[in-house]
Amino acid sequence: MEKLSLSFGARRALTTARRLCDFLAALACLWAAAWHTPPGAFFRGLTARIFHSRTSARPLLAYYGGGVYAAGVPDSLPALPTRILSPDEALGYGARCALPQLDGDERARIFNRARQEGFNPATFADPRGASAELGHLLARYRAQMGGSDDLAMLDLFCGELAASYARTVVKPHAELPALARSLPPSLCPKGIGLAGQALGLSTAASLSWPVSEHVRVVSPFGEREHPTLGGVRMHRGVDLAVPQGTPIAATGPGRVRRASEDSVNGRCVIVDHGHGVTSAYLHNEALLVDAGDTVSRGEIISRSGSTGRSTGPHLHYQLEIAGLPVDPLLFRKAR
């Protein structure tokens, strides 16, 4: 009887352990569904709207077209010049940031082809001229392909054969997601990701500043003591000290994704600049654009204020790459 009792107890313990494992696995599935699927993003966004809170949920379209930009931002970035970059130089800056992440053989392939085009790869590591030289190389590839910046960047990171094939399948000025979909899934996945990263960083590097670059930053990017809610919280942008009614300019060309008001962000504008890059302008007193509008760099899109969860007139400026907030000061030209 004692032996049977022990066996029954062991079976009971095993059953309990299995149930616990099943419960934990179910929790893990629910977490993954909430944080890494489109339905989860939808319900998190809906909850944030109902309770007037912020959310890190990605826009639904990001799950279907922006995967090539998911590489985000490297841990360290080369310093930008204290001036607005030319389009080709900005393109070269993005490539310069992504190149070190390739393995030696891939970099050697890129450098050998650059030599064939008459470039000296040693200049790609020169802090003073690397962005300009890589920009010239990408301009050469763009001209050879008769396509877009996206096609030129695909050419750089995945090679001429892959880029030529993609060009024959899709329209000449197709963006990277369409180019990537035209290639076999196993062909150059890392190179496609780094091409997306380079395009995102080049877009961010080409942006200007929403107000004078010498306006004081009163609250930087990063963790801080929240001024209204208390406790240490992540500050996803920078707060700029500007008086009520200051004209706020779009930092680059793009399409207005949002122009509306809520109790947290106040009257806010979000501009999609392409290549996974968006800029946000919060707490305005007036909005001068509507969702769907196309804006140019320097166009006045709002006037600053203190709407939403705010303690006084200022502009909260936020920059995101691949759906993740980055420090806008990394891309400010004035130092």
Predicted features and spans:
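Surface-exposed, glycine-biased beta-strand/turn segments
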Residues: 188-265, 297, 326
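Conserved positions in beta-strands of structured domains
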Residues: 218, 255-257, 285, 302-305
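Hydrophobic membrane-insertion alpha-helices, especially the h-region
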Residues: 18-35
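Extracytoplasmic
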Residues: 94-97, 102, 147-151, 204, ...
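N-terminal Lys/Arg-rich, disordered targeting/topogenic segments
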Residues: 1-15
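Zn2+-dependent peptidoglycan hydrolase active-site motif and core
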Residues: 233-235, 250-288, 313-315
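Catalytic glycan-binding domains that act on GlcNAc-containing polysaccharides
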Residues: 47-204
